[in-house]
Regions:
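A short acidic, Gly/Pro-enriched loop at the edge of an enzyme's catalytic core
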Residues: 103-115
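Conserved beta-strand signature within the Rossmann-like core of class I S-adenosyl-L-methionine
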Residues: 141-149
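A short glycine-rich, Lys/Arg-flanked "PGG" loop and its adjoining helix->strand segment in the class I
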Residues: 129-140
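Class I SAM-dependent methyltransferase SAM/SAH-binding core
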Residues: 53-104
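A short SAM/SAH-binding and catalytic strip from SAM-dependent methyltransferases
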Residues: 114-127
Length: 194
């Protein structure tokens, strides 16, 4: 299924996620996907504030992980797949779910204290050009925890470094590459904190 997703073009990606929504969580449980829990724990260590944006929330795995880590504030989930959002709504952990892309978030400037995103900045999905939008809604002093695949990290980090040079973002931590998706031995990811 992952190859089916990664091989799709931008116009068919949302539709493929809509079709996958009913088995997405089961599939990822079978594959041992640890990204949501690792990112949630990382965000809680760095301070979540009271309003968190789950950018590319999918079926709500990150929201569930955040709540299980003790996050009690407002949780906003954004995703471009209506099927995924319907599944996320059934999780009962989000205060607000929004159908939108990360490139054009319908949120006010500086409206969230933290951003979390797992499995989104990857092949055929979202590139580093979306970082400026996350910075916009987070504002000064916000925290962002994002999983970044090592095979595309250099390309993504160019956009992050541009924001850093402009004084809009500051790299806080980048974990060593790890297997967050054990079923895909070749895929290593880091948790990056800004």
């Amino acid at each position: 299924r992952l190859d089916w997703i990664f091989d799709s073009d931008a116009s068919s990606l949302a539709e493929r996620y809509d079709r996958w929504a009913s088995t997405y969580d089961t599939d990822h449980d079978e594959w041992g996907w640890r990204g949501p829990h690792a990112a949630a724990e990382c965000l809680m260590l760095h301070g979540s504030g009271s309003v968190v944006l789950d950018a590319g929330c999918g079926t709500g795995q990150v929201g569930v992980a955040l709540r299980s880590c003790g996050f009690e504030g407002d949780l906003i989930g954004v995703d471009f797949s209506s099927g995924m959002l319907a599944t996320a709504a059934r999780q009962g952990v989000y205060d607000q779910l929004v159908h939108a892309t990360i490139l054009d978030l319908p949120l006010a400037e500086s409206s969230v204290d933290a951003v979390i995103s797992t499995g989104v900045f990857t092949h055929g999905h979202v590139g580093g050009e979306a970082f400026s939008e996350l910075v916009r809604v987070g504002g000064h002093g916000s925290v962002a925890v994002i999983t970044v695949r090592q095979d595309i990290a250099d390309d993504l980090m160019v956009d992050a470094e541009t924001l850093e040079a402009a004084g809009r973002w500051q790299l806080v931590e980048r974990s060593k590459p790890q297997q967050l998706h054990p079923s895909r031995d070749e895929v290593l990811q880091s948790l990056v904190v800004w």
